[in-house]
């Protein structure tokens, strides 16, 4: 079995040497960066021994700040490609060592280039799936390689948060304020956790390449711990002035620092036992006092009350009266504040009358003859009030021999005669004057409709809606005084009507409509019986 295992390991070494030689030959023929590619291949070959220093220096020269950024980007890409394609623990570990040394020894521009490369593409240091199953020892080596890659990845993240390298620059956590402490201390504690994960176990303890990488991790762990110690001391000094949320975060950091201090002491003891980091100066780890931890926990429990007391004190300071010099100011008397009266309602401003546009054609002006006629009609319709109202007599008209209500009104004795005499038209108008008024009204209305607006067409009226001036309602009986007053003129109306039918021509329907439309007292919705029947001129159509 042992002979078979030795032959397999020899075969793997032989195949690894062939791969390295082939890669170097291809780089000499096809690569634009021949020297850089050859240095990368020889610095990360399959030989299970530390790399030669001259090849590592050649790589550092290619990624220095004086070189073009294209050369730096190509070198990072070549290292990432070499790391992602290999399944050999020696090649992977040597590549990680080159990157680690470059982070420590090259300027900070290399940090920025690696971070930008990891953002633009997949994380070049992500080796969570790396595994070398060539043998039992290779399994142990592969596990340590994965932890080492996590440490380097966290180192870049810590550099991004702190904006400086802990290994190269002195720690700055001693003078930070509370917000910066709460941001930077978690990054340092996470980096210290990755350091503690690099503790070797099993076969990895005796491997020379792993011991070389572990020595660099130990040297950085002391710097990380010093930065954390300064930050924790600064945090404790500001703890009792923090708000509750910040105090809870600070208490969690302090608890984490206590645990990390114990684990870091064990880590240093293991490294000393295997003679790793003999040239390094191990620092003494001091445990934070547990009594102080209890005081911090009690403060966090009472933090809301303390915050309230402080808030009241701040309010009292803000509301305290300010001192005023008597020379410059005089103390005004106390004035009782009166409630302001309710505002008076705002009066709405009257809108300005809109000026009408002048009627140049005088289409809206009423005719002068029409206005004069209206005045005469108003005078004619004025009713003289009766001073003494006589009682009406109730006479039984059913006992008479008359057959019509008109005859009964004439023959029956009534006390309304006096009232009819008193209810004459004002001004002493007689029948002829009243007839002339009717004729003038008809003539003026005809002239107005024909000549007042020459652009307006004559409307066509319905024959069933004809009416005359002073035409009473067709469905309601006239008042009794008007009936008695006009009974004497009944005979004259009949005679005038018969004469018109015998002598005059048939009146035109339109003229009859014009006459009937001039009566504002007529009912326009009552039919006129037989509108098509020709009629003569009748100034008293109501008494037909």
UniProtKB/Swiss-Prot annotation:
Residues 28-166 form the ENTH domain. It is found in: Membrane, Clathrin-coated pit; Golgi apparatus; Cytoplasmic vesicle, Clathrin-coated vesicle. Residues 338-361 are annotated as: Disordered. GO terms for biological process: clathrin coat assembly; clathrin-dependent endocytosis. Keywords: Coated pit, Cytoplasmic vesicle, Endocytosis, Golgi apparatus, Membrane, Phosphoprotein. GO terms for cellular component: clathrin-coated pit; clathrin-coated vesicle; Golgi apparatus. Residues 338-358 have a biased composition (Basic and acidic residues). Disulfide bonds: none annotated. The modification Phosphoserine is found at residue 342. Pfam families: ANTH (PF07651). One of its GO terms (molecular function) is clathrin binding. The keyword Glycoprotein does not apply. InterPro entries: ANTH_dom (IPR011417), ANTH_dom_sf (IPR014712), ANTH_N_plant (IPR048050), AP180-like (IPR045192), ENTH (IPR013809), ENTH_VHS (IPR008942). Coiled coil: none annotated. PANTHER family: CLATHRIN ASSEMBLY PROTEIN (PTHR22951), OS06G0175500 PROTEIN (PTHR22951:SF32). This is Putative clathrin assembly protein At5g35200. It comes from Arabidopsis thaliana (Mouse-ear cress).
